[in-house]
């Protein structure tokens, strides 16, 4: 299995969410093929760009395919300030959420090799390479951590939609109520689980 990762939002926007989605590459490709055939979508799949109906269909395909996700969430109003009183940097928050989301998966992998694929678009490549190396150290010999251009990774694009869905709910966006209805069955079945970050390490 592969864990695909992407984030949405930022503390300046009220919350940041980080989705770690577990799917086989084959399942991710099949979800994309069906979604694009039905909707006619061309180009990159982004949670911030699709309609509510398209989001519901994509997440239904994800659920049917046996996809699962841990989503780490940090909300500005509930995040305790660091000891120095300074607001955390975007990168520090990103790294903490990534660690929480991936860390939530590792006890459940049962020793099965898990590859972790991270979107390479948010930060400088050198910074992200350091993040990748830290994840690789945590995985040890159980898997491989890599960076991917989201435009070329079907799984990362699905993770983007999951992260964006939870972000909308957390910040109570105008679409939050409808998105909450869309994801409620997946939260109830634990296909999507949420871990909240309230304090940076």
Where are these regions (language model features)?
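Phosphate-ester processing/binding pockets and catalytic centers
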Residues: 1-201
């Amino acid at each position: 299995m592969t864990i695909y990762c992407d984030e949405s939002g930022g503390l300046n926007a009220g919350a940041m969410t980080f989705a770690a989605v577990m799917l086989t590459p084959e399942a991710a490709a099949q979800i994309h093929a069906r979604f694009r055939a039905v909707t006619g979508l061309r180009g990159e799949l982004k949670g911030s760009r699709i309609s509510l109906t398209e989001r519901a269909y994509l997440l239904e395909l994800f659920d049917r395919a046996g996809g699962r996700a841990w989503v780490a969430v940090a909300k500005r109003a509930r995040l305790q300030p660091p000891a120095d009183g300074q607001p955390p940097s975007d990168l520090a928050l990103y790294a903490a959420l990534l660690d929480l989301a991936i860390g939530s998966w590792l006890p459940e992998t049962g020793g099965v090799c898990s590859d972790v694929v991270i979107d390479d678009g948010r930060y400088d490549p050198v910074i992200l390479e350091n993040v990748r190396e830290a994840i690789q150290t945590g995985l040890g010999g159980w898997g491989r951590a890599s960076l991917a251009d989201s435009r070329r990774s079907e799984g990362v694009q699905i993770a983007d939609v999951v992260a964006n869905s939870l972000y909308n709910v957390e910040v109570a966006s105008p679409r939050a109520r409808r998105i909450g209805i869309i994801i409620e069955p997946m939260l109830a079945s634990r296909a999507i689980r949420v871990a909240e970050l309230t304090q940076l390490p």
